[in-house]
Amino acid sequence: MSRPALRWVVAEGETLALGVWLDRHAPGSQPSLGDGRVFVNGKRITDPGYPLEPGHCVELYAARVSDGEVRVLARFEGVVLVDKPAGLATEPDHAGIAASVVARAAELLDTPRAELHAMSRLDVGVSGVVLLTLDRGARRRIEALRDAGRVRRRYVAIGSGGPNPTSGVWDAPIGRGRGTLRSAFGRDAESATTRYRTAAQAGSASLLALEPVTGRTHQLRVHAAHAGCPLYGDPAYGGPKRLVQADGAVLTLRRIALHAAWVELPFLGGVRVESALPAALLELWSALGGAAEDGASALE
């Protein structure tokens, strides 16, 4: 393991829950719990309620930098669409210790980072199309289109189980859950709607085509889990972290099986900006017994 980016020793009188302690010493770093980047006395801790005692050593590791590269897919009228690899944050870490899509895109475009604004945010373990704006006018235009429901987004996911019925609409409000997680019908829940379709099945697994109507935090992950098909590689919401194959080999999932496959904007004349399904998801679907051509059905 690499060296931690930040390390503290809990002082006398700081008998606090880990989440509260992080808020005090590293504001904005609580998402690192869900990412598995916080250790106490050498043990990975994901529970924000974990009790700290004086003398405990708390270590915060930087987010794992993805091996993939950010690619510019399209640029027009103050809008940039880029391809995000899994393992890379969309925006800089709140603790200031992680690389990000925004930072890399700024380098590629030779643009000051402060001028780029992420209009769509993918979780660290998710890949695909991210929409950025270069100026305030473009930001307002995209916000207006999004509020009017005219920005279409298609995600492809692999669920450990299948929804019943196989297609339809998930309409469950999403609120706060434990720590930084979200929960269907959780605290302070807000309306959340996702259109879904089962593109293919392989045993108990399902290849899902998802279109979010709203944009709540972790919406697709929460809705899939609530529907009984948590996503592979998403243990935070009950998804499997490993897959034991027929020959006994164990496939460890290092990302969430969720990919932002395309975005469609009205001023593109109906043209979709696409990101190809990543090899890791194709490999997983094949290992589950799925067919190579199933991916095309999920993109339709």
Put a short name on every predicted segment.
Residues M1-E300:
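RNA pseudouridine synthases
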